[in-house]
Amino acid sequence: FFLDHKVPQVKFVDRTFNCKHDHAMAIWKYIQEHDNGITNFHFEVAADLLNDEKIRLIRQMRPGLIQLEIGVQSTNTDTIREIRRTMRLEEVREHVARIKEKGNIHQHLDLIAGLPYEDIKSFRKSFDDVYSMRPDQLQLGFLKVLKGSYMQEMQQEYELRYKDEPPYE
C-alpha cells in the first residue's frame, strides 16, 4: 500500500523492531525488493541487536530507502540498568560505524536528559560517546514522566521534577 501510493515516509516506531531476526529481515528484504525509488522507511532499532546478516542487507540498500533511529538514551551503565534497559555500547559503536562506512543509511542517535543517576558530568560523557560515533543526527530528548509509569512511581527516590500535564517534561 505505502509503496504503491508512493508515501514519502513510513515510520516503524517500535524500538524492538529488530529483536526478532526473521521478522526484521523479511520486512527489510520486502522493502528492498519492492523499492519504488521514493518511499523512505524509518526504523527504531536496538543497534546492539543487529548482526552481520542484517548489516550486510542494510548496506546493500539504496541510499535513502531506510533510515535508522537508535535510542542510546545514555551511556551511563548505572542509568541504563536503573531504567531497565540493556545495551552493549561497544556493539552499538561497532554497528553504527559499519553502517556509516557505506554511506547509504541516515542514522540518528538519541539521548535523554534527566534520567536517574545522570548528572551533568555523566550526561556530558554520554553526549561525547554518542557524538564520537558521528551520527547524521544526534537527537536530544527530555525525560517524560508519564502517569502510571515506573518513573512516576520512583519520582521521589529520583527527586524528579516534571510537569503533570503534557508534554510531561
Segments the model singles out, each with a brief description of its role:
Residues 28-29, 126, 155-158:
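Short, hinge-like loop/turn segments at secondary-structure boundaries
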Residues 53-58, 116-134:
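Catalytic cores of alpha/beta
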